[in-house]
UniProtKB/Swiss-Prot annotation:
Domain tr-type G, first and last residues per copy: 10-204
Descriptive protein name: Elongation factor Tu
Residues given in the record as Mg(2+) binding sites: T26
Keywords (A to Z) from UniProt: Cytoplasm, Elongation factor, GTP-binding, Hydrolase, Magnesium, Metal-binding, Nucleotide-binding, Protein biosynthesis
Region of interest (G4), residue spans: 136-139
Binding site for GTP: 19-26, 81-85, 136-139
GO cellular component entries: cytosol
Location of this chain's protein in the cell: Cytoplasm
Species annotation: Mycoplasmopsis synoviae (strain 53) (Mycoplasma synoviae)
Amino acid sequence: MAKLDFDRSKEHVNVGTIGHVDHGKTTLTAAIATVLSKKGLSEARDYASIDNAPEEKARGITINTSHIEYQTEKRHYAHVDCPGHADYVKNMITGAAQMDGAILVVAATDGPMPQTREHILLSKQVGVPRMVVFLNKCDMVDDEEMIGLVEMEIRDLLSEYGFDGDNAPIVRGSALKALEGDAVYEDKILELMNAVDTYIENPVKELDKPFLMAVEDVFTITGRGTVATGRVERGRLTLNEEVEIVGLKPTKKTVVTGIEMFRKNLKEALAGDNAGLLLRGVNRDDVERGQVLAKPGSIVPHTEFEAAIYVLKKEEGGRHTPFFKNYKPQFYFRTTDVTGGVEFEAGREMVMPGENVNLKVKLISPIAVEEGTKFSIREGGRTVGAGSVTKIVK
């Protein structure tokens, strides 16, 4: 089949299926693609092609993820589905697959299970704003009352973790029946996508966020001044705008008097650009790798925060042994490592390889971080874990 043209007139939204093992996440993903393909809005995909998820690397961690794309009348979607529970945890914590909203799949035959709870919590921690629920396998439950009870249980669970349990849409259906072409259940897939279209909000575009660029390198141009290079993470910057140099040292304000990309002078730098910024009145020693250049007042340096972390298993190249309270690894933010200590939640003595835990981190130097900032945990340059900042402490 010919490649679908990328239609820029449609809003682009990133979604993903989450939920307990064997509740039907991958079958639902295949059903969405297949039902929409009948309207010419997607390529049909079978279960096997999605389940056979390719490996990718994010922050030094290997993750299996399937990416598929499809359209509705309103939007263009990128949809991620992971084969295993650990892949979900790693995906969310590394931010490898950004989600503007999630489709929570719950089997009506089982109701919410341990991983249902875990995925909802993780979604909240990494900042997934909204969730739509697909109640799967409804063809296997005869008792209407039973399905109603499962729905109530899901709403309570969503509310417990800070989602809007009262108003989240819950669509009843059967992904397998829809995939097999049963018209009644195909309509349920369209009903689900309609809920996703309306309930999951358009994301704030990276360009509309306040400017931020992590400094990768610094050099001096004789007679002109100091240039900091890096990739613009978000926002836009125009010539002669003020920026702050944040992190590692006291925050300092400067004006950008030149923007260069591929040896050409530009009037502005945009999210995604690799740019060199000429900084007025800044010495070579005032700015270093690991700091960020940001819109004044938009981000401040911190040393203490809470985080959700995933610790790599031995088989994934991680530690072979647990770590304890006096553990002091390096925390790699954007472009640099900073040493820090960890504090566990009450009652926890150690953290085992393969665990997903919440802990408090205290860095020895302040770094520009905010809720949602992602980092790697490293020992001597080797990645042993990944984390996402869930709450700023200091």
